[in-house]
Amino acid sequence: MRALLPEEGRGLFNDIVSGRVLGAGRHIRMIGDMMRSIAGLRIPAHEKLERCLRLGEFFKETRGKSSYAIVTAVNLMTAGFAEADGEADVDRLIEERVLAYFENSERDTLEIVRRFRNLVENQGLKKLMVFDYSSTVEKCVVGLHLPVEVYVPESRLIDGGRPFVRPFVEAGHKVHFIADAAMLTVLKKIDAVFIGAETFYPD
């Protein structure tokens, strides 16, 4: 799959599959950027669409198994690709589909951040715990107008806690980076726990 990408897309691909970059939201943006890099290749239009579809299927079957947000995003970004006319302006189609997804996603994220801020501030929540890296959870906590105390378990399996620390400190919050095994020792003092939605499964 990596070989189907231009050079600028291969680094993004590697960052996802190696786990160097975490967060479904970030991975979705990187997948969109890879599709846009395919649009810039000097290859037949139908092959560009085919590569984008194959790339999307790859990530749906791999990263999408742990985060359905990936599956939904890829489906939205590639909508209409399979039926596209060979004479269509494929570069423009790819660009428009990817950008439309991110415009809608940005609007939705801003609304989530606003509602999160209302919840935390209206309920007077002062001590939070965040678990398992999520770029959306990061944006929510960074977007709070008032400083809070945040406990961040290390999420050792994928080092999923560490990426939270710097943004929270820079936003003015008091941060405790703790071992996973210490979670139960602090839960009694926590007002609320927030995790990325992909941590939950219907079953």
Role assignments for model-derived ranges:
Residues 32, 131-132, 195-196:
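Short beta-strand segments
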Residues 24-25, 127-137, 157-158:
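Gly/Ser/Thr-rich loops at beta-strand to alpha-helix junctions
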Residues 147, 153-203:
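Conserved phosphate- and dinucleotide-binding cores of soluble alpha/beta proteins
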Residues 134-146:
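Histidine-anchored nucleotide/phosphate-binding helix
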Residues 104-124:
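A short, well-structured juxtamembrane/interface segment
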Residues 125-126, 148:
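Nucleotide donor/acceptor-binding cores
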Residues 1-97:
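Long amphipathic alpha-helical segments
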